[in-house]
Curated annotation (Swiss-Prot):
Pfam families: HATPase_c, HisKA, KaiB. The gene is sasA. Member of the two-component regulatory system SasA/RpaA involved in genome-wide circadian gene expression. One of several clock output pathways. Participates in the Kai clock protein complex, the main circadian regulator in cyanobacteria, via its interaction with KaiC. KaiC enhances the autophosphorylation activity of SasA, which then transfers its phosphate group to RpaA to activate it. In addition to its output function, recruits fold-shifted KaiB (KaiB(fs)) to KaiC to cooperatively form the KaiB(6):KaiC(6) complex (independent of SasA kinase activity). GO terms for molecular function: ATP binding; phosphorelay response regulator activity; phosphorelay sensor kinase activity; protein kinase activator activity. Homooligomerizes. Interacts with KaiC. Participates in the KaiBC complex, whose core is composed of a KaiC homohexamer and 6 KaiB. It catalyses: ATP + protein L-histidine = ADP + protein N-phospho-L-histidine. This is Adaptive-response sensory kinase SasA.
C-alpha cells in the first residue's frame, strides 16, 4: 500500500524554456520521484492554456505552481529548481507533523520574505526582457542609420565627379544636369528611408522587380570610369547575352555592384585588371563574380569582413577599407534570399561572389525576399 501523499505541481513554461538547465534539472528530479510524496506534474504551455496566467496571477514564466498540499505556492525566476529543493523538506516536515496532530506553518517572516523574493525576481525578469528588446531595437536602428548614411555617399560622389568632368569639358551642361537630377532623386529616396528607420523594418524598404543586371553593371562601370582609367586598370566583363533577368530591388543591386567594383579598384595595383562575370547558375539563381588581382585577404579575415565595423586589410595605396560597405552588401544579398562570399589568396587577389534570384514572373505581393 502506498502511503505517500500527493504533491500536485503545474509547470507553466514555453517550449524553448523547457530546455534550460534549471528546468531540465527540475523535471529530471521530479521524474525520479525521490521524495516522500507521490508527485503529479502537469506541464502547460501558456499559449495553449492562457487562462493559467490569469488564474494563478502569473507575471512571468517559467513558473512552478504547487497546488497541493495546501497552501498554494508559486516559484518563478531563473532558479526554480533550487527554490523547490529549499521548500521540499519543509513540506515533508509539515506532512509528518500533521500526521502527529501538530500544526507547523511557515513563520510570518518567512512567508513575507518569500513573497518579496518572488516579486523581485518577477520584476527583474520583466526588466531584463524589456531591456533586451530595447537593446535589439536600438542596435537595429543604429545599423540602419549606418547603412543609409553609407548609401548617401554614392550619389554625392557621383554628382561631384560629374561636376569635375563638366569643368574639364568631358561632358556638356545638359549631361551634367541629367546626372545631378538623377542623383538628387536618389538622395530623396534615401531621405525617405531615414525617416522610416524608426518605424519600418529594413526589409520593407525593398522594392523587388524584374531587372537586368548586365545593364546595371555597365552603368556602374561607366560611373567609376574616372577611378579605373586614372590608374590604368582594365575591366573585363563576361556577361552572356541571354542572361535571364533577376527579381531584385534595382537600387540595392546597383549599390552592391558599386561597392564591390569600387573595392576591386581600390585594392588593385596600378595597371592591374578586374573581371566581372555573371552566369545563370541554376534555374533559380544568377551568380555574379567580381575578381581583382590585388594583395588578397588573409584567411582569418575572410568571414569577418562581412560583419559590421570591420576594417579590411591595407590597400595597395596604403589606406585601409572600412567594412560597412561589405556589411551592407551582405544584408542586401541575404534579404533577397541569396548569399555572398569571398575566395582569396594572399598576393593572388580576391573574387567576391553573390547570388540573386532569377525573375520567374514574381510580383511584389509574393514573399520571395527573406530577412537578412
Amino acid at each position: 500500500m502506498n502511503d505517500k501523499k500527493e504533491l500536485k505541481l503545474i509547470l507553466v513554461a514555453a517550449r524553448n524554456q523547457l530546455s534550460s538547465g534549471d528546468i531540465k534539472s527540475l523535471i529530471a528530479y521530479l521524474e525520479s520521484n525521490d521524495c516522500e510524496f507521490e508527485i503529479s506534474l502537469q506541464i502547460s504551455e501558456p499559449t495553449e492554456q492562457p487562462e493559467l496566467l490569469e488564474l494563478h496571477r502569473l507575471v512571468a514564466i517559467p513558473a512552478l505552481i504547487k497546488i497541493s498540499p495546501a497552501p498554494k505556492q508559486i516559484f518563478a525566476g531563473s532558479n526554480i529548481f533550487s527554490q523547490f529543493q529549499k521548500w521540499l523538506p519543509r513540506w515533508t516536515q509539515e506532512g509528518l507533523t500533521k500526521n502527529l496532530g501538530i500544526n507547523l506553518q511557515p513563520s510570518k517572516i518567512d512567508s513575507i520574505r518569500t513573497q518579496k523574493e518572488f516579486l523581485l525576481e518577477d520584476e527583474l525578469l520583466v526588466l531584463r526582457q524589456e531591456n533586451e528588446t530595447l537593446t535589439k531595437r536600438i542596435e537595429s536602428q543604429e545599423r540602419l542609420l549606418r547603412m543609409v548614411a553609407h548609401e548617401l555617399r554614392t550619389p554625392l560622389t557621383a554628382a561631384t565627379l560629374a561636376i569635375q568632368s563638366q569643368k574639364l569639358g568631358q561632358i556638356d551642361i545638359s549631361k551634367l544636369q541629367e546626372v545631378i537630377k538623377r542623383r538628387l532623386e536618389e538622395i530623396e529616396l534615401l531621405s525617405q528611408d531615414l525617416l522610416e528607420v524608426g518605424t519600418t523594418k529594413w526589409e520593407a524598404l525593398f522594392n523587388p522587380q524584374k531587372i537586368d543586371l548586365g545593364n546595371i553593371s555597365a552603368e556602374v562601370i561607366l560611373e567609376l570610369e574616372k577611378f579605373w582609367r586614372l590608374r590604368n586598370i582594365e575591366i573585363d566583363t563576361d556577361i552572356p547575352s541571354d542572361l535571364p533577368s533577376v527579381f531584385a530591388d534595382q537600387r540595392r543591386m546597383r549599390q552592391v555592384l558599386l561597392n564591390l567594383i569600387e573595392n576591386a579598384i581600390k585594392f588593385s595595383e596600378d595597371s592591374g585588371s578586374i573581371k566581372i562575370t555573371m552566369i545563370h547558375k541554376t534555374n533559380q539563381w544568377v551568380e555574379i563574380t567580381i575578381c581583382d588581382k590585388g594583395a588578397g585577404i588573409p584567411l582569418s579575415e575572410q568571414k569577418r569582413i562581412f560583419l559590421d565595423r570591420v576594417r579590411l586589410p591595407q590597400t595597395s595605396e596604403g589606406t585601409s577599407g572600412f567594412g560597412i560597405g561589405l556589411s551592407v552588401c551582405r544584408r542586401i544579398v541575404q534579404v533577397h534570399g541569396g548569399r555572398i562570399w569571398v575566395v582569396s589568396e594572399l598576393s593572388e587577389g580576391s573574387c567576391f561572389h553573390f547570388t540573386v534570384p532569377v525573375w520567374q514572373g514574381q510580383n511584389k505581393e509574393q514573399q520571395y525576399l527573406t530577412k537578412g
